[in-house]
Amino acid sequence: FHAPYAGHDGIQLAIGQVFTKGEDFLFSYYRDMLTALSAGMTAEELILNGISKATDPGSGGRHMSNHFAKPEWHIENISSATGTHDLHAAGVARAMVYYDHKGVVITSHGESSSSEGFVYEAVNGASLERLPVIFVWQDNGYGISVPKKDQTAARKVADNFSGFKNLKIIHCNGKDVFDSMNAMTEAREYALLNRNPVIV
């Protein structure tokens, strides 16, 4: 199993670069190979996952490929069911606020996952409770094989959530490294300073 990240290069590089080891938590998805590399995982660690070796740092060889993780760094295990990890991210952010932990939670997936109820619940809860979660939605125009126009009301998926209070929305071109770095840097600084969620 392999899900390529071509066309997602800019945003994935940026996610990994703003992820602060020791402070932040990262919940990525199966297409986030460059995110994992950019966050500091090695090519060897990714290959160990891909060939299900016992020395895979995420699962000891028990996960399917493209499920990159390094729990000791808070690069958390990937769920195959898309969108469910947004709830995990919101829960971790709630604990971070409760225990006054400095840092943010970053969660990432494709745009079609925003059609899932899990995602709505997570964004709603993070907005209501003012949680430092950065929801990164990588929009390539298709959800598996379904065109975006057949699954969402707004041309830009994040705009479906524009009515939520305490929620900042930042648009960027995920193919453009500089635009993506600017967006992710702004998102992390905003979430950290204001303790509010952001959609990128």
Predicted regions and their residues:
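Cofactor-binding active-site loop characterized by glycine-rich and histidine/acidic residues
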Residues: 1-129, 136, 147-166
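Thiamine diphosphate
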Residues: 137-199
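Residue-level recognition of the N-termini of beta-strands and the immediately preceding loop/turn
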Residues: 103-105, 133, 196-200
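Residue-level recognition of short, well-ordered coil/turn positions
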Residues: 23, 131, 192-196
